[in-house]
Regions:
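N-terminal Sec-pathway targeting helices
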Residues: 1-24
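Membrane-interface motif at the C-terminal end of an N-terminal transmembrane signal
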Residues: 18-39
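Secondary-structure boundary elements
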Residues: 40, 44-135
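Extracytoplasmic/secreted proteins, especially bacterial periplasmic and envelope-associated proteins
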Residues: 92-103, 139, 143, 150, ...
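Short His-Asn-centered micro-motif
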Residues: 133-137, 158-161
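Hydrophobic/aromatic-rich core segments of domains that either
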Residues: 142-216
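Alpha-helical and coiled-coil interaction segments, frequently adjacent to or embedded
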Residues: 205-242
Length: 242
């Protein structure tokens, strides 16, 4: 009887020890691998959910509006950031867009507290010089919006939200109009990225969504010196927010 109890006791201790070792390995050694595995599983669920969703519906509401950039304010922004010199050698709208996007991309991502008070390109840049922690994707998009508009490049700030209403994480990017290609394309100054198909054609948000649904190739390109290491994780992230 004593031998049986002793055996049971040793077995329980061994199981507890193995559990502790397993937890420590997951926590300190294989933490990134486990997190990526869990994210991949969740990411595949996002893709399946997106595949069951409806297509974008055309809006029947006709709203007359005009992208306004007062000449004096636009010149102030161009002079402050020296945009005319930056894009003078650009031979198309897309090249100019990427040159300007690097300004916003130079500010790193964070959700600061306190947040900026004034949301215009110049004040956001001044704020970033005093706060090394940076700001979030929405603020990046607002800054890029004003920078592009000041040189006459039409663009929109687009909020991309998940279907899960309890998920408070969304992503905000810019949709830029390229007159040479007669289309809108996505630019993400927060993650320093834009998307193309296998032939290098620039993609809009709607085209990205369609390609994820159809499981077709999307390439996530970096427009800065930083490389995009886990494109598959970025793919899953977009599946969640489209």
């Amino acid at each position: 009887m004593k031998k049986t109890l002793k055996f049971i006791g040793y077995s329980v201790l061994a199981i507890i020890l193995l559990l502790v070792v397993g937890v420590l390995l997951i926590r300190f050694v294989f933490r990134d691998e486990v997190a990526n595995f869990a994210y991949e599983l969740r990411g595949k669920e996002h893709i399946e959910l997106l595949q069951m969703a409806n297509q974008y519906q055309s809006d029947t509401i006709n709203i007359a509006f005009e992208l306004s950039s007062p000449a004096d304010k636009a010149k102030e922004i161009r002079d402050y950031f020296q945009l005319d010199s930056l894009i003078k050698e650009s031979n198309n709208t897309w090249d100019a867009t990427l040159r300007i996007a690097q300004i916003a991309a130079s500010i790193k991502h964070d959700n600061p507290d306190p947040r900026p008070i004034k949301y215009n390109a110049i004040d956001l840049w001044e704020w970033a010089k005093e706060h090394a922690n940076g700001f979030n994707c929405r603020t990046h998009s607002i800054m890029l919006y004003e920078l592009l508009l000041s040189v006459g490049i039409a663009n929109r700030v687009i909020t991309c939200s998940p279907k899960d209403t309890t998920d408070r994480d969304c992503h905000v990017v810019n949709s830029v109009w390229l007159p040479e290609k007669n289309k809108w394309v996505m630019v993400d100054s927060d993650k320093h990225a834009y998307c193309t198909d296998k032939n290098g054609n620039l993609l809009s948000l709607e085209e990205m969504r369609d390609r994820i649904i159809m499981q077709e190739y999307i390439n996530f390109n970096s427009f800065t010196v930083d490389s995009i290491n886990r494109k598959d994780l970025l793919h899953y992230y977009w599946a969640k927010n489209l």
